[in-house]
Amino acid sequence: MKIHKGDMVIVISGPDKGAKGKVIEAYPKRDKVLVEGVNRVKKHVANSATERGAESGGIVTQEAPIHVSNVAIVDSEGNPTRVGYRFDENGKKVRIARSNGKDI
């Protein structure tokens, strides 16, 4: 999966189209990412359970994972771009933005 934790992404389809956020968590086996402030859902939490952002029980609003095909990584200029790879001088694989060729 080409999008990792900590990347800035923009939602390119769905109800939150156009929203930008930071990737909180990546789930490569499920091809999903958790983006800050995007795909917020209400979850009913028991009094004893402690979920993300829940201090006590009740109805909690939190982010839900979104499929990786619905987000695009943001390049250094703030535009959505695809991700490519190249090898640097040490032979290490580096992610690059396809739009401008700069490292991500």
UniProtKB/Swiss-Prot annotation:
Family: Belongs to the universal ribosomal protein uL24 family.
Protein's gene: rplX
Subunit structure: Part of the 50S ribosomal subunit.
UniProt-listed Pfam families: KOW, ribosomal_L24
Reported function: One of two assembly initiator proteins, it binds directly to the 5'-end of the 23S rRNA, where it nucleates assembly of the 50S subunit.
Domain of life: Bacteria
Alphabetized InterPro entries for the sequence: KOW, Rib_uL2_dom2, Ribosomal_uL24, Ribosomal_uL24_CS, Ribosomal_uL24_KOW, Translation_prot_SH3-like_sf
GO molecular function, one term: structural constituent of ribosome
GO BP terms: translation
This protein's name: Large ribosomal subunit protein uL24
Organism: Corynebacterium aurimucosum (strain ATCC 700975 / DSM 44827 / CIP 107346 / CN-1)
Key words of the record: Ribonucleoprotein, Ribosomal protein, RNA-binding, rRNA-binding
One GO cellular component term: ribonucleoprotein complex
